[in-house]
Amino acid sequence: MFSPVAEIREEDGVKLYWTPASPFTRKVGVVARELSLWEKIEIVPTTWSLEWGYRTVPFTPGLADANPVARIPTLVTDDGDALGDSTLACLYLNDRSTDRKVIPDDTSKWRMWSLYAVADGMLEAQILMRAEHLRPQNIRSNSFIEKQKDRIERCLDAIELRAGELEGPLDLGQITVGVTLSYQDWREWLDDFRSGRPELSAWYKNFADRPSMRATEPQETPEH
């Protein structure tokens, strides 16, 4: 089971505002582990009222000061720069790593970024659905939920057609696809992605067994 505890090294000073339920935050956590940087990060757990999806709720102390958008993940670098976006946080960690990279440094990076954008857009649709499901029934929009489901199905079909790109050296595109599929599995109101997508299903079965994925399995975020 995932435990958001990392060794804190004062000389590094990198902080990550975290929730174990967020796939965007998990993406950063997987990257940090794959790049052997996890132990250099101070994890700051955040709490969220279940009303976060439709109204302003109290924030964990320090989050809104670091990032006025008050979004997670927010990574604060050792220079004090707040990166309030998972893509920026992954770019920072990739740049910081000296032994391994998850972002190619040649022209193949554009194909990776293309796949990444599809998977990241699917993550966004999943979280928009989550927020809508948290709204009281009388103000919930079923048509909005269906709109996000349609987006997710399109993204899954597109990734299935590009499943061959998921092979080869580990990169950020693969990580984001893996995290997205895991979230699709975790939330019971999201449809099973495996039906009609044999290539994606076979790839995910192996990817989900990576130590970085097992160590960051999602859990519900504390409300208090």
Language-model segments: residues:
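Non-transmembrane alpha-helical segments in soluble domains
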Residues: C90, N94, W113-Y116, L156, ...
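GST-like domain detector, emphasizing the conserved glutathione-binding G-site
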Residues: M1-N142
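Short, surface-exposed recognition loops or helix-turn segments adjacent to catalytic cores
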Residues: D105-S108, L170-L172, P218-T221
